[in-house]
């Protein structure tokens, strides 16, 4: 994602960004992917320098019942149990979903924070991230889903962006119009001072934008160290398929300490120094 695009996202949504004290920065940026930097699970591969999360046939069309996950190879510390400090973080990525039949696309892609060593979870509507639509603290998983199929047991009636906390049943959703086969520019931020998780998505080709936010106390929901990355699934019934590609990805996080009192805006840092 170009830094100018992220700047547009920031100005459009006027995100409430962190004012926590500065400290060590964990950051990375991929404009071309290589398998050595990732833990690839299920059907996920690195293909033509992009993350291809679900299986594609030789003719480029997606397959049924595919599940793939890709996580950054190094754990990320998101809080410090000994001091109580909590990290603010921001991530941006460009994703592309293509459904041969847009009216029957399934199932979606998620950005997820999971326990280190986590294995793929249930297929189809669970997006490979969860096993249940009932809250379960032992899952220790927070995700932002970009859901292309409405599962009547737990989803709203339309495609949506959702914030998921230890369950596939989102605690907050916003309707989302899929721009089929078009790139989506996504920015997700977490403000440790307010516990506010914000996800925004822009389709530059259509000049459409979407945003969802909710407060999440990650110290109650996640382990101290997590793996971060992506998970995606396709449907189980004929015709309910789509491709899921991540074309670029950047991340920055900041865990406060007492060595400095100068505020740092983590999302601005991401734009200036990582992208």
Curated annotation (Swiss-Prot):
What InterPro entries does the record tag this protein with?
A: ConA-like_dom_sf, L-lectin, Lectin_LegA_CS, Lectin_legB_Mn/Ca_BS, Legume_lectin_dom, Leguminous_Lectin
Q: Which residues are glycosylated?
A: 34, 101
Give start-end of the signal peptide: 1-22
Q: Which domain of life is it from?
A: Eukaryota
For this chain, the Swiss-Prot or TrEMBL PTM comment says: Leu-264 is missing in a major portion of the beta subunit, suggesting an origin by sequential removal of amino acids rather than a processing by endoproteolytic cleavage.
Entry keywords, A to Z: Calcium, Glycoprotein, Lectin, Mannose-binding, Signal
Which cysteine residues pair off into disulfide bonds?
A: none
PROSITE patterns (alphabetical): LECTIN_LEGUME_ALPHA, LECTIN_LEGUME_BETA
Any one GO MF annotation of this record: D-mannose binding
One family from Pfam that matches here is Lectin_legB
Per the entry, what this protein does is: Metalloglycoprotein, containing Ca, Mg, Mn, and Zn and the carbohydrates galactose, glucosamine, mannose, and fucose. It agglutinates erythrocytes of blood group A1.
Instruction: Give the UniProt family note.
Output: Belongs to the leguminous lectin family.
Q: How does it assemble?
A: Heterodimer, composed of an alpha and a beta subunit derived from a single precursor.
Give the protein name, as stated in the record.
Answer: Lectin DB58
């Amino acid at each position: 994602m170009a830094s100018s695009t992220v700047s547009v996202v920031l100005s459009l949504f006027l995100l409430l960004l962190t004012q926590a004290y500065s400290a060590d920065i964990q950051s990375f940026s991929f404009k071309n992917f290589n398998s050595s930097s990732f833990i690839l699970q299920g059907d996920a591969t690195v293909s033509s320098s992009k993350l291809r999360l679900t299986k594609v046939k030789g003719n480029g069309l997606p397959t049924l019942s595919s599940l793939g996950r890709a996580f950054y190879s190094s754990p990320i510390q998101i809080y410090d149990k000994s001091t109580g400090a909590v990290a603010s973080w921001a991530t941006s990525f460009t994703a592309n979903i293509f459904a041969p039949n847009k009216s029957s696309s399934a199932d979606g892609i998620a950005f997820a924070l999971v326990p280190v060593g986590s294995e793929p979870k249930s297929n189809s509507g669970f997006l490979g991230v969860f096993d249940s639509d009932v809250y379960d603290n032992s899952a220790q998983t927070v995700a932002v889903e970009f859901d292309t199929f409405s599962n009547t047991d737990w989803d709203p009636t339309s495609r949506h962006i959702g914030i998921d906390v230890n369950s596939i049943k989102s605690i907050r959703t916003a309707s989302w119009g899929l721009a089929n086969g078009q790139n989506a520019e996504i920015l997700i931020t977490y403000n440790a001072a307010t516990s506010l998780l914000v996800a925004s998505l822009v389709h530059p080709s259509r000049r459409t934008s979407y945003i969802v936010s909710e407060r999440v106390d990650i110290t109650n929901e996640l382990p101290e160290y997590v793996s971060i990355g992506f998970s995606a699934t396709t449907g189980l019934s004929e015709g309910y398929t789509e491709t899921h590609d991540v074309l670029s990805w950047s991340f920055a996080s900041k865990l406060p300490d007492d060595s400095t009192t100068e505020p740092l805006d983590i999302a601005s840092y991401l734009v200036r120094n990582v992208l």
